[in-house]
Amino acid sequence: MSSRILTSDVIGIDALLHDHHAVLAKSTGGAVAVFANNAPAFYAVTPARMAELLALEEKLSRPGSDVALDAQFYEEPEAAPVAIPCGKFAMYPAWQPDADFQRQAALWGVALREPVTAEELAAFIAYWQAEGKVFHHIQWQQKLARSVQISRSSNGGMPQRDINSVSEPDNHIPPGFRG
């Protein structure tokens, strides 16, 4: 395990316990890195150095300027709901299926146990944006339902797992085996 030592003065924990006043008095910056089992355990700091560090922290926590911005610069205006275009339209980035999409999909014969994930919707939109085809809103929803059904069928009907997640090992030892 790598670690970074923040002072050039290093001492073992046994030496610090033996005579901590002398160790801290000899330190150049008022701080000593204390090692236990050849690994940094903690830092020992003189009261004067601790006062300096606290004063520095307090100084840095104060704003550097007394200029305050109006609250209007921090508040984002609420996005107006996107109206569904009439007639046929090409897929666009902000397209969303209806709120009762799962129920509608069931009426079309596509039973979705879980709602459509943001990743599934993004992949669908990206694919059909590139295609440039035009369909009615209801047709887009039917295509989304079928697309999600097909993509999930290869994974037992569940959304695909995140490929970046790290699996956790099973530490349980079955009966009859030694651990």
From Swiss-Prot:
The lineage of its organism: Bacteria, Pseudomonadati, Pseudomonadota, Gammaproteobacteria, Enterobacterales. The gene is dnaT. Belongs to the DnaT family. Residues 151-179 are annotated as: Disordered. It comes from Salmonella schwarzengrund (strain CVM19633). It comes from the Bacteria. Involved in the restart of stalled replication forks, which reloads the replicative helicase on sites other than the origin of replication. Can function in multiple replication restart pathways. Displaces ssDNA from a PriB-ssDNA complex. Probably forms a spiral filament on ssDNA. The keyword Ion transport does not apply. Pfam families: DnaT. One of its GO terms (cellular component) is primosome complex. Residues 151-168 have a biased composition (Polar residues). This is Replication restart protein DnaT. Homooligomerizes. Interacts with PriB. Component of the replication restart primosome. Primosome assembly occurs via a 'hand-off' mechanism. PriA binds to replication forks, subsequently PriB then DnaT bind; DnaT then displaces ssDNA to generate the helicase loading substrate. Keywords: DNA replication, DNA-binding, Primosome. One of its GO terms (biological process) is DNA replication, synthesis of primer. InterPro entries: DnaT, DnaT_DNA_bind.
